[in-house]
């Protein structure tokens, strides 16, 4: 933007210009103090991508490796897990058990709906490379179904996109943080109705390396406001895009002049004020939520004195629910004190990766420079023709004795031993064994020993699994809070019943309204969010089917061949979604009903034939 355009804007909107200048200063200061960490991120990425650069004493690359054995990529990929930790919700109050079950099912269905599997697949790489990764929860009003307005949105935020407040190592303790993203100028125009055609891209390092004049850098600042809520400020270059002092509040269009009897602004209807008919509006905060519920209201008494009730619609007004916390979740690799990010796997094995590159290059040079050499008498040569037989012209038998071939073969034994040692050192540092990688393990001479070796490696990696579970538990908590705040229509969910049948219900925020001891309404968000440790087996349906087969054969369901036994078995199979299990269970139930009916008929016939037990004997 030209200097005279900046001057024009500063005169026209002094408050906006002052605010923009203040936030840009904070951003530049935070970015400068975070620059070393950003440089380290790019270095770690280069290791994973198999960079040929050979560094010396943490300095710039001075040499290129001829080939790369990418142990960083290999060891990180060995740890990738595609499993998604499933939510476990525990209510604080006994009467909220059913609500907790609905929350669990709502979150479980959101995993597929929001493609959290794809997000997890990306973070399984990013987290060990950079030491941490981030997930952002938002409410997207443009999503939803025919019957719902909006839906949750969960996206990944790359570590290099986030600029933290200097000196603070926990997100929840920060007064503010920044997220930078690359957007097209057309997208900015569509979403925020601001022209940024004259702005330039300032942070090109956060995207793929491809020059484009259509891209700009959008900076978003999240901050804590004076009321304890969350605010948002967004800009692009020298253009303010959005400023929300209360980011989580709701705003509506109201008339600039008209007010109600209680002094509140009159809301616009279809862009027109219903009082004065003008179209001039302003954005005002919508404080109160109106929820319609149904309650049994006593209408009187019947003739016999019993109370007569009727289900009547009741309108409840209470302040809109707000999450009041940052919409971002951090997933650390390994905890590291005095650091926002965790400990990176690349940081741990970088020295070994450099050694492997150097030794691999040294071995290549030795092998490529080795070869065979011919000794000839002085002054003699070999004809260089395409003929099969080459002619060497000699004069005496003594000259023939001087013709020889010398083969020079390099010894790379020690180099290979050293390189293998560096590789094993890297694996040991990360706690990865050959058995864990699925390779041949000479130390494991039986299946039990091999499983023990795998379990040992899994134990070394337990901390990473705990941090992953913690991050997803925090994610599920924020997803619930955002749904409670912004899901104005009930969201359909289906719940698997005890008999394997599906029952359909809704996640309705009206169900989370309670009254305290004084009779005041409040939003019930008193639930504990954790991860179901048994979810891996429960989500592996084939494993559950096999477990049921084993239990059937062992007699856990009862004697094999009896209908009661088959009823229990197929009930469990239906609960675990075995194909056609519901139809088979129905047929088993019909057979069981017929057998019980036959038994009753036989008992009745026996009683008739044998007489009544207390019948008097005939004289």
Residues covered by each model-derived region:
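Extended, helix-rich architectural segments
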Residues: 1-291, 297-303, 313, 414, ...
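Solvent-exposed, non-transmembrane regions of membrane-associated proteins
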Residues: 326, 333-335, 342-355, 359
